[in-house]
Amino acid sequence: FMAMAQFQLIDGDSKQQSNSVYNLPTGSIQSPTADGLISGMSTGAGQWRSIYMTFSAHYAFKSRYIADFSVRRDGTTKFGDNKRWGTFPALSFRWNVVDEPWMKGAQKWLSMLSVRPGWGRVGSQPGAEYLFFSKYTATDSYNGANSIYPSNIRLSNLQWEEKETWNVGFDLGLFDNRVTADFNIYTQMTSKLLMTNVNIPSSSGFPSLSWTNVGKMRNNGWEFNINGTDVVKVGKFRLGFNVTFANNKNEIVEMEPTALANLNKDFDNNNGSYLTRVQLNNPFGAIYGFRYKGVYQYSDYSEVEVPGVSGPN
């Protein structure tokens, strides 16, 4: 049995500055001290902190039955006070079938055979700071006088995006692991999907939300890998191989209507490009196009007779 605890505190900050200048002798000048007329200047700064604590435990019985458990507690200043913390556990098991007493007869050629089910949850956070604050912008464009106006909607209910995964895996090794293979089946549900720049009704006074939780998405699939090491050995020549097969099915389970409208633009795609749509119960970004019915034949319409228009007179 083994247990371990970890703790980490992360402090991040960002700063930016921009100048707009005109009447420069050439457009290749980039120095902010160059002789020119300044039309605008802006600065910005951001700061955020995150903290996480983890606890993990590992237990093995006779090297045949193995269990792992972990839990992670995350907190970040990118969310409001009531949504700042997230808890993300994980649990997995492993049964080394090849080490069972009744498998001794096969151990001469079977070096590994195991089954490993697992479950876990992880979280994602937005890539911006101060989303839960009301911010204001100073301007002098109101009747020539200085003024202040709100520049964002306070996102106090923004939450962690969560991905919950169930999986079952199988491992196989042959001839002292010269040939190995693994097969995994999984299902993953992503809830509270984070999306940026989602358009909202103009009656709110703002064109869009910088970040919001919009819905759920499911992924089901499988993956098969097979590897060979030194399968062919001739002198100093060695030959191995690595082959992978995989299949994934994606489905939008839930999504806010405003997010769907934001993702699905007008049917105005350019010639030669694909039109993609996001719809409930369909894959994310499904490609739309004409259905193929075969090669067009001239005789498909040349032999059709229309009374009074074509055919014998």
Residues of each region from the PLM?
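Extracellular/periplasmic, surface-exposed regions of secreted and cell-surface proteins
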Residues: F1-L280, G285-I287, R291
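Extracytoplasmic gating/loop element in the C-terminal half of outer-membrane beta-barrel translocons
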Residues: L37, T76, Q297-S302, G308-N313
